[in-house]
């Protein structure tokens, strides 16, 4: 997961 993006 990348902080600043929705959980994918």
Swiss-Prot record:
Secreted as UniProt keyword: yes
Subcellular locations according to the entry: Secreted
GO molecular-function term, one example from the UniProt record: toxin activity
Mod. after translation: The amidation of Phe-8 is essential for rat ASIC3 current potentiation. A synthetic peptide with Phe-8 not amidated does not potentiate ASIC3 current.
Modification sites for Phenylalanine amide: 8
GO cellular component: extracellular region
Claim: Glycosyltransferase is one of the keywords in the record: no
Keywords annotated in UniProt: Amidation, Ion channel impairing toxin, Proton-gated sodium channel impairing toxin, Secreted, Toxin
Record's signal peptide: none
Tissues/organs with expression: Expressed by the venom duct.
Family the entry assigns: Belongs to the NPY family.
Function: CNF-Tx1.3: Potentiates ASIC3 (homotrimer) currents and heterotrimer-containing ASIC3. Is less potent than CNF-Tx1.1 and CNF-Tx1.2. In addition, it slows the desensitization kinetics of ASIC3. In vivo, intramuscular injection into mice enhances acid-induced muscle pain.
The protein, known as: Conorfamide Tx1.3
Organism: Conus textile (Cloth-of-gold cone)
Top-level taxonomy: Eukaryota, Metazoa, Spiralia, Lophotrochozoa, Mollusca
């Amino acid at each position: 997961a990348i902080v600043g993006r929705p959980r994918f």
